[in-house]
Amino acid sequence: MKQKNIDEMYMHRCLQLAKNGRLLAKPNPMVGAVIVSSEGNIIGEGYHVRYGEGHAEVNAFRSVRPKDENLLCEATIYVSLEPCSHYGKTPPCADLIVRKGIRRMVCGCVDPFSAVQGRGIEHIRKAGIDVTVGVLEHECLMLNREFIVRNTQNRPYILLKWAQTANGFIGYSHITSDRKATLQISNAVTKMLVHKLRAEYDAILVGRNTEELEHPRLTVREWNGKNPQKIVLSSTYKNNGFVDDVLYVNSLQQLIDTINQRNNTEQKICSLIVEGGAHTLQSFIDAGLWDEIRIETAPFT
């Protein structure tokens, strides 16, 4: 097997491991690490389990059995994201790799965080360790797209989501005496997937019309997970702020500013779902404030 194929095989394992930290590693990135002996055996592996605790590299080295410690000098460590080079809640992983005397490091992608940005790779190379960067780079970047957007664009990762009929209608509210009767596009399976998605995101936003007509809870009910922060957007609101745990904002700029302010203090909103309605979704599209769009299309018109 060619070295390129070998590197990709172990990087795939890093990505598998990294995904285990999806819910608890935030606001840190998801990272996986695998240590492979010169004979091609995995002697250690780990992932970043929880924010504030050991990084993937630390956990991978901890998993190495005492009898295999002597193999590290000829081993290769695979890591999906560049090792950190600064002191934060934990010491630099780049220093740890150098101390362990690893022969080679294979890195999926460079960390865009301003305190790293290639410094970890440079430090390891200066120590005489062979470094390969960019193995499965696209997959590694996509895994942490929320982290990357937050650190490069200073805003949360924004997903626009809607359900529509086969001929492109998002749906409508037929106003009756009770002021609410909505066209139902989703089914039981897609509802479950929607709730799974909510559990993976930090906040969810709707416009004033949707809020007043439907009063959506926007909670996680058909999946296990934490409820996202509910946000309502309307240009008619005079004041911004929280009312009964719901955040009300009157502009897109105010939305971003409020989220950034809260991220600097307590609540970390790294990702946002925008569920509509149509006017609200269009405002995000017109402003270029989106990273991903997911559309559920019904088989009827």
What are these regions (language model features)?
Residues V31-G40, W162-A163:
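Short beta-strand scaffold segments in enzyme catalytic cores
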